[in-house]
């Protein structure tokens, strides 16, 4: 066998020319222990907080504890595939999530993988799930209403775009129902919605998604599901995934509504992980930084100025209380972070007042700045009248000998409560809310028995949509979004016609028991 020296030298020269001296350097460690969704890793001395780690069998983790001799990581996948002694590699990346309009209409898990059997998501951009909240100078004041379509909330506890409003109450008081109604009411309002389910039953999530599909709300909604069957690390990550998706839209000038259902279970999952990572426990065994857990999440909701996109994120976190105790650790934390709370009472719920909003205990720190003028004009005395009613109701139980003024206050309060009762998934437009509130403010409902109020609501809304003259007045109010004296009188006259129509159909109706007879005779004139 003969060798051509020239050919060999050419081959060697070619290889020298194409030699790539780049060295790929990877840092790796070893799993010391694994269990309960936590891995302790030795050897990753340069790992950073929140870094993505790669385990064998395509399982990933995230650094959550940095100790002198080891790194504590949460496992974002099947921990049964990991063994002691396995090699763990750094990725030099933090946890990221896909963002953009491709997610609309989809149900994803906390790792942003689709779980709705509708195929892969064609995303073009990702963002890290942890980032500093929008700075003070980048924000705008909250001045635009985010309509929930729920009369009790939009009138007495208004929510503005960019606000954080807590929904708090015992289990089975309608917290999720309010959140779902708020999403359904955003149809055709150019608001994108995100529903983050934390520790919920999978059957509950299926029902939520079916409701959203039924009312055409899934087309502008993303559902992030970290259900009760998911490990604690995924439940911990899910709200941050949700708000990261929202931030992309906010920076592109969109308004976003995000629901966290619920942050009580989020705190429990974080407590579980912290105890397993051997962090020192504090009050109720929660770690010392549980306040920061929620504050850094909720502070990312904002309304930004035009230089930063001009969009907004409105957050409605949900907290579940035990026997109405809002002074527990997590409820007080979240109350102090948010811009107000909607308190749901199990007592009201059991009395049939639904939504069971306790208006006396609820507050919106943004207030009337987040209301259109027409609603602001007619809802001013609502909270006061209800407060007087609840105060007098307690005294009325002790004696039946009441003066006329007290009877009138009790009667008006009972009728207001009936006016605020609303069927689920039946949102009201702002113009319809303004008309209903006008009938309350003008004391027009005093002519009706309490049991006729629900029928009155249906009749008056129907009248202003079907009667030609009334419809024109409704349209005018919708356009100018404020009551002038003439329009107010014209709308009241139409409302009086509805009252007369109902009272004529009541057997043995005696107007004298409700007010001055001559005043009743002038209705509709």
Curated annotation (Swiss-Prot):
One GO MF annotation is: ADP binding
EC code? 7.1.2.2
Source taxonomy lineage?
Answer: Bacteria, Bacillati, Mycoplasmatota, Mollicutes, Mycoplasmataceae
Tagged with keyword Ion transport: yes
What family is reported? Belongs to the ATPase alpha/beta chains family.
Q: What's the catalysed reaction?
A: ATP + H2O + 4 H(+)(in) = ADP + phosphate + 5 H(+)(out)
Q: Where in the cell is it found?
A: Cell membrane
Question: What's this chain's function?
Answer: Produces ATP from ADP in the presence of a proton gradient across the membrane. The alpha chain is a regulatory subunit.
| Oligomer and partners | F-type ATPases have 2 components, CF(1) - the catalytic core - and CF(0) - the membrane proton channel. CF(1) has five subunits: alpha(3), beta(3), gamma(1), delta(1), epsilon(1). CF(0) has three main subunits: a(1), b(2) and c(9-12). The alpha and beta chains form an alternating ring which encloses part of the gamma chain. CF(1) is attached to CF(0) by a central stalk formed by the gamma and epsilon chains, while a peripheral stalk is formed by the delta and b chains.
The species this protein was found in = Mycoplasma mycoides subsp. mycoides SC (strain CCUG 32753 / NCTC 10114 / PG1)
What are the coiled-coil residue ranges?
A: none
* Catalytic class of the enzyme: translocase
A Pfam entry, by short name: ATP-synt_ab_N
Any keyword ATP-binding? yes
Protein residues bound to ATP: 169-176
**From which domain of life does this come?**
Bacteria
- Please name the gene that encodes this protein: atpA
InterPro entries (alphabetical): ATP_synth_asu-like_sf (IPR023366), ATP_synth_asu_C (IPR000793), ATP_synth_asu_C_sf (IPR038376), ATP_synth_F1_a_nt-bd_dom (IPR033732), ATP_synth_F1_asu (IPR005294), ATPase_F1/V1/A1_a/bsu_N (IPR004100), ATPase_F1/V1/A1_a/bsu_N_sf (IPR036121), ATPase_F1/V1/A1_a/bsu_nucl-bd (IPR000194)
Please give the name of this protein. Answer: ATP synthase subunit alpha
What kind of membrane protein is this, topologically? Peripheral membrane protein
Recorded GO cellular component terms are: plasma membrane; proton-transporting ATP synthase complex
Q: Where is this site: Required for activity?
A: 362
**UniProt keyword terms in alphabetical order:** ATP synthesis, ATP-binding, Cell membrane, CF(1), Hydrogen ion transport, Ion transport, Membrane, Nucleotide-binding, Translocase, Transport
């Amino acid at each position: 066998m003969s060798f051509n020296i020239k050919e060999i030298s050419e081959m060697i020269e070619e290889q020298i020319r194409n030699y790539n001296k780049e060295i790929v350097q990877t840092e790796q460690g070893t799993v010391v222990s694994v269990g309960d969704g936590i891995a302790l890793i030795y050897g990753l001395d340069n790992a950073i907080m929140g870094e993505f780690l790669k385990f064998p069998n395509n399982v990933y983790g995230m650094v959550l504890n940095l100790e002198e001799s080891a790194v504590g990581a949460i496992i974002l996948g099947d921990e049964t595939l990991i063994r002691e002694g396995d090699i763990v590699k750094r990725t030099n990346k933090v946890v990221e999530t896909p963002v953009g309009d491709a997610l609309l209409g989809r149900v994803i898990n906390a790792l942003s993988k689709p779980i709705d059997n509708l195929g892969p998501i064609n995303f073009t951009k990702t963002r890290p799930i942890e980032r500093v909240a929008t700075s003070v100078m980048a924000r705008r004041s909250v001045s635009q209403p985010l309509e929930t379509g729920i009369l009790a909330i939009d009138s007495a506890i208004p929510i503005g775009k960019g606000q954080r409003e807590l929904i708090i109450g015992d289990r089975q008081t309608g917290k999720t129902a309010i959140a779902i109604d708020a999403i359904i009411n955003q149809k055709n309002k150019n608001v994108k919605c995100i529903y983050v389910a934390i520790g919920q039953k999978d059957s509950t999530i299926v029902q939520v998604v079916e409701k959203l599909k039924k009312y055409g709300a899934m087309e502008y909604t993303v559902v992030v599901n970290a259900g009760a069957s998911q490990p604690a690390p995924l439940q911990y990550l899910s709200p941050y995934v949700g708000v990261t998706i929202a931030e992309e839209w906010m920076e592109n000038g969109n308004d976003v509504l995000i629901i966290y259902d619920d942050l009580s279970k989020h705190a429990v999952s974080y407590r579980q992980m912290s105890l397993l990572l051997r962090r020192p426990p504090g009050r109720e065994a929660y770690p010392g930084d549980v306040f920061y857990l929620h504050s850094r999440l909720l502070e990312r909701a904002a309304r930004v100025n035009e230089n930063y996109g001009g969009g907004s994120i409105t957050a409605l976190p949900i907290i579940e209380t035990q026997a109405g105790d809002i002074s527990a650790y997590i409820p007080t934390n979240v109350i102090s972070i948010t811009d107000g709370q909607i308190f749901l009472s199990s007592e009201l719920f059991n009395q049939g007042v639904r939504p069971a909003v306790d208006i006396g205990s609820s507050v919106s720190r943004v207030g009337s700045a987040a209301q259109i003028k027409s609603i602001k004009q007619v809802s001013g005395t609502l909270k006061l009248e209800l407060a007087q009613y609840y105060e007098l109701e307690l005294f009325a139980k002790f004696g039946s000998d009441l003066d006329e003024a007290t009877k009138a206050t009790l009667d008006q309060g009972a009728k207001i409560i009936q006016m605020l009762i609303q069927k689920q998934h039946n949102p009201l437009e702002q113009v319809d809310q303004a008309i209903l509130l006008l009938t309350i403010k003008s004391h027009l409902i005093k002519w009706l028995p309490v049991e006729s109020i629900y029928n009155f609501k249906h009749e008056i809304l129907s009248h202003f949509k079907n009667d030609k003259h009334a419809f024109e007045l409704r349209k005018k109010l919708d356009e100018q979004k404020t009551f002038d004296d003439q329009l107010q009188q014209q709308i009241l006259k139409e409302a009086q016609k509805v009252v007369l129509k109902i009272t004529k159909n009541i057997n043995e109706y005696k107007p004298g028991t409700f007010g001055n007879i001559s005043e009743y005779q002038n209705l509709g004139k």
